[in-house]
């Protein structure tokens, strides 16, 4: 398999969590969420290149946390941008061509090795891969014009890690000047470089953005 990288995006402020510190630094089973996330990729492959994207003001705090919790997993910390788009773009400057690169949310600490492995293996052939899960709740479209039920079988919840041949993702980010993207598959699709492939995600691969999410993660974590 090609050389592997993961860009872990963790520069958010976590306003929905209503906590005094950003959500990626909140404790989960006695240590910061972000450490669990990094450990998940290190367990998958101890040789993976881990690139951590933080805001400038968070880098010093992260360094102090690593010292406090004796966190020794090797990773490269870089400064994020004003939006997620520019944070990932900054991370890509540290990624070589002709490699495989994953982009993962820093607050998805419960990602399993099986999902990571499946995404990387599929990306070798499909070039751009994303995990997703079907919607099980009823779904409605509510706008100024419509208030109607829609067919939930046509919609999926998209997760990370999203994995790419590095050339594909680098070229997609270089080809667009818009930063109105919520994930990296959307950036690749906008450039019409390739057609992304969906793989089966996991319900336990939750994104921790609210206090309820944190409680669920506490119950699910090994």
From Swiss-Prot:
One of its GO terms (molecular function) is 2-C-methyl-D-erythritol 4-phosphate cytidylyltransferase activity. The record marks 152, 207 as: Positions MEP for the nucleophilic attack. It comes from the Bacteria. One of its GO terms (biological process) is isopentenyl diphosphate biosynthetic process, methylerythritol 4-phosphate pathway. NCBIfam families: ispD, PRK00155.2-3. PANTHER family: 2-C-METHYL-D-ERYTHRITOL 4-PHOSPHATE CYTIDYLYLTRANSFERASE, CHLOROPLASTIC. This is 2-C-methyl-D-erythritol 4-phosphate cytidylyltransferase. It comes from Azobacteroides pseudotrichonymphae genomovar. CFP2.
């Amino acid at each position: 398999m090609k050389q592997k990288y993961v860009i872990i995006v963790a520069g958010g402020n976590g306003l929905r969590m209503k906590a005094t510190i950003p959500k990626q630094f909140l404790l989960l089973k006695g240590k910061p969420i972000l450490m669990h996330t990094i450990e998940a990729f290190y367990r998958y492959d101890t040789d993976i290149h881990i690139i951590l994207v933080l805001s400038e003001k968070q880098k010093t705090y992260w360094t102090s946390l690593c010292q406090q919790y004796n966190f020794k997993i090797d990773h490269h910390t870089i400064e994020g941008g004003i939006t997620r788009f520019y944070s990932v773009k900054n991370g890509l400057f540290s990624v070589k061509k002709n490699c495989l690169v994953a982009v993962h949310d820093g607050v998805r600490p419960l990602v399993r090795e099986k999902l990571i492995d499946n995404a990387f293996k599929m990306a070798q052939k499909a070039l751009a891969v994303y995990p997703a899960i079907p919607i099980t709740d009823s779904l409605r479209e509510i706008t100024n014009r419509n208030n109607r039920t829609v067919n939930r079988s046509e919609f999926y919840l998209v997760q990370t890690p999203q994995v790419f041949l590095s050339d594909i993702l680098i070229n997609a980010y270089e080809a667009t000047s818009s930063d109105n993207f919520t994930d990296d598959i959307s950036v690749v699709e906008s450039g019409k470089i390739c057609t992304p492939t969906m793989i089966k995600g996991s319900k336990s691969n939750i994104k921790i953005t609210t206090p309820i999410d944190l409680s669920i993660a506490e119950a699910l974590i090994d």
